[in-house]
Structure formats: structure tokens, C-alpha cells
């Protein structure tokens, strides 16, 4: 009877080891869950960025104002008979 209990205990320990440390065990599960959470956060951030870009594309396709704004800010273009003023910020170090 003692031998039977020893064998059952050994099998139980083997199963416990496999459960905690084996392939697809608890530690692998926790590691995979952390990776999934990290990827979900990254996907959320990328999805928000995609929405901003899609809105900008829609605005550029549909409206003239967005094109004018981009031309003014990025390329410093002006309309005919319009005066362009650039106001430089004062550098605090050069006072």
C-alpha cells in the first residue's frame, strides 16, 4: 500500500510540475497574457492614429480649407494681394 501511495504522489508531483512549469503551463499563460495586453495597447494607439490620418485624408479630399491651411503652414504660401507677416518669438537667452 505504501508503494502505491508513493507512486500516486510521484505522478501527482509530475502533473503539478507540468502544470506550473511545463509547456503551455501557468507561467507560459501569464507571459502570453502580458504580451496580448501589450499588443492590445499598441493596436489601440495605432487605431487612434489611423483615425486621425483618415480624418485628415477625408478633409483634404472634401474641403478646400484644409488644403489652404496645409499650404500656409507647411509651404508658407499666400493668396494673391495678401501680405505675409512672420512674428519671431524672442529668445530668452539672447536678451
Swiss-Prot record:
Job of this protein: Essential cell division protein. May link together the upstream cell division proteins, which are predominantly cytoplasmic, with the downstream cell division proteins, which are predominantly periplasmic.
Chief location of this protein within or outside the cell: membrane
Keyword Transmembrane carried by entry: yes
Assembly and interaction partners: Part of a complex composed of FtsB, FtsL and FtsQ.
Database matches in NCBIfam families: PRK00888.1
Top-level taxonomic group: Bacteria
GO cellular component entries: cell division site; cell septum; plasma membrane
Cellular compartments annotated: Cell inner membrane
Topological domains annotated Periplasmic: 22-95
Transmembrane segments: 4-21
GO biological-process terms attached to the record: FtsZ-dependent cytokinesis
Family statement drawn from the similarity comment of this UniProt entry: Belongs to the FtsB family.
Membrane topology (Cytoplasmic): 1-3
Membrane topology: Single-pass type II membrane protein
Protein name in the entry: Cell division protein FtsB
Xref: PANTHER family: CELL DIVISION PROTEIN FTSB
One Pfam short name: DivIC
Gene for this chain: ftsB
Keywords: Cell cycle, Cell division, Cell inner membrane, Cell membrane, Coiled coil, Membrane, Transmembrane, Transmembrane helix
UniProt keyword annotation of Endoplasmic reticulum present: no
Recorded coiled-coil stretches: 28-62
Species whose genome carries this gene: Mannheimia succiniciproducens (strain KCTC 0769BP / MBEL55E)
Amino acid at each position: 500500500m505504501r508503494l502505491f501511495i508513493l507512486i500516486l504522489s510521484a505522478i501527482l508531483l509530475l502533473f503539478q510540475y507540468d502544470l506550473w512549469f511545463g509547456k503551455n503551463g501557468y507561467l507560459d499563460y501569464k507571459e502570453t497574457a502580458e504580451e496580448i495586453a501589450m499588443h492590445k495597447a499598441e493596436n489601440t494607439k495605432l487605431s487612434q492614429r489611423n483615425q486621425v490620418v483618415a480624418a485628415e485624408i477625408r478633409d483634404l479630399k472634401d474641403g478646400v480649407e484644409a488644403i489652404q491651411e496645409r499650404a500656409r503652414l507647411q509651404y508658407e504660401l499666400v493668396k494673391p494681394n495678401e501680405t505675409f507677416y512672420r512674428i519671431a518669438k524672442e529668445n530668452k537667452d539672447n536678451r
